């Protein structure tokens, strides 16, 4: 199994280079939007395009992936809300296990059902410990996953959860406050997790401005994911990408 995308996560982390990913929900874009998004992502030097959502009702995931692949050279990584969200045209798949919850279906149940199709797709599969953090309001992901998020002020619980995920073999930790969260994850929580986990840390949910993206990187996030804010204002793509890239250490 090829590991090009995962290796890029590892290489960038080792060099202290921070990455910016734009999260796009296939339900919320039409073919006309994709050309504009691809151009803006390319101009902003976006590192990854994450594609998926808690609910993907439409069936044009393949078309969406292929359009991005045609229009830009940015790697497309699937961020699936369910096992059905698989496209063989993508560069990689984040194989999410909701380790912050106690819903067995999202820890392993759905993975058992989806494993044959995922393997057949030939996609690069990146095992991902998904840690849902309370963002101050019920989110689609907490409702759909039927799990209780980790309280936003319980840094040690988040740390221990991420540590357990890494020791169980998860290659990546994804800390998420959920789409449209009122409050993003605190820097103190990110820092606590980063102090004990060597796997790449992805952080998303509730990040609405460039300063927050920058501070999250400084706290220990390796990849910043923004979706909801960009859906509302695509001009933020360059602003946030620049802030994330500016958080890398200065090479002498």
From Swiss-Prot:
One GO cellular component term of this record is: cytoplasm
What SUPFAM superfamilies does this protein map onto?
A: FMN-linked oxidoreductases
Please tell me, according to the UniProt entry, what happens when changing residue 143 to A: Forms homodimers. Strong decrease in activity
Positions with a binding annotation for Mg(2+): 25, 54
GO-annotated biological processes:
glycerophospholipid biosynthetic process
Write out the residues that bind sn-glycerol 1-phosphate. Answer: 174-180, 205-206, 227-228
Reported cofactor(s) = Mg(2+)
Keywords for the protein's UniProt record, in alphabetical order? Lipid biosynthesis, Lipid metabolism, Magnesium, Metal-binding, Phospholipid biosynthesis, Phospholipid metabolism, Transferase
- Tell me which domain of life the UniProt entry assigns to the organism this sequence originates from: Bacteria
A GO molecular function assigned to this protein is: phosphoglycerol geranylgeranyltransferase activity
Q: What is its EC number?
A: 2.5.1.41
Supply the InterPro entries for this chain. Answer: GGGP/HepGP_synthase_sf, GGGP_HepGP_synthase, GGGP_synth, IGPS_HisA/HisF
Entry's family note: Belongs to the GGGP/HepGP synthase family. Group II subfamily.
Q: How does it assemble?
A: Homohexamer.
Q: What does this protein do?
A: Prenyltransferase that catalyzes the transfer of the geranylgeranyl moiety of geranylgeranyl diphosphate (GGPP) to the C3 hydroxyl of sn-glycerol-1-phosphate (G1P).
Could you tell me what this protein is called?
A: Geranylgeranylglyceryl phosphate synthase
Q: Which organism is it from?
A: Chitinophaga pinensis (strain ATCC 43595 / DSM 2588 / LMG 13176 / NBRC 15968 / NCIMB 11800 / UQM 2034)
């Amino acid at each position: 199994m090829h590991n090009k995308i995962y290796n890029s996560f590892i290489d960038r982390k080792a060099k202290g280079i921070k990455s910016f990913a734009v999260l796009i929900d296939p339900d919320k874009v039409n073919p006309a939007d994709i050309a504009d998004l691809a151009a803006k992502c390319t101009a902003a030097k976006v590192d990854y395009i994450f594609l998926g959502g808690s609910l993907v009702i439409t069936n044009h995931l393949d078309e969406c992936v292929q359009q991005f692949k045609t229009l830009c050279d940015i790697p497309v990584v699937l961020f699936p809300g369910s096992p059905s969200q698989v496209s063989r045209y993508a560069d990689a798949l984040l194989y999410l296990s909701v380790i912050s919850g106690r819903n067995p279906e999202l820890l392993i149940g759905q993975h058992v059902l989806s494993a044959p199709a995922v393997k057949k797709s030939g996609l690069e599969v990146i095992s991902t410990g998904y840690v849902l953090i309370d963002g101050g309001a019920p989110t689609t992901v907490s409702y759909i996953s039927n799990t209780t998020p980790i309280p936003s002020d319980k840094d040690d619980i988040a740390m221990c959860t991420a540590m357990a995920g890494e020791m169980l073999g998860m290659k990546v930790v994804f800390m998420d406050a959920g789409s449209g969260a009122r409050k993003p994850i605190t820097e103190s929580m990110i820092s606590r997790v980063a102090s004990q986990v060597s796997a790449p840390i992805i952080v998303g949910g509730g990040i609405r401005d460039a300063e927050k993206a920058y501070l999250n990187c400084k706290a220990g996030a390796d990849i910043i994911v923004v979706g909801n804010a960009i859906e509302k204002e695509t001009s933020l793509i360059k602003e946030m990408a620049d802030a994330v890239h500016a958080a890398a250490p200065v090479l002498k």
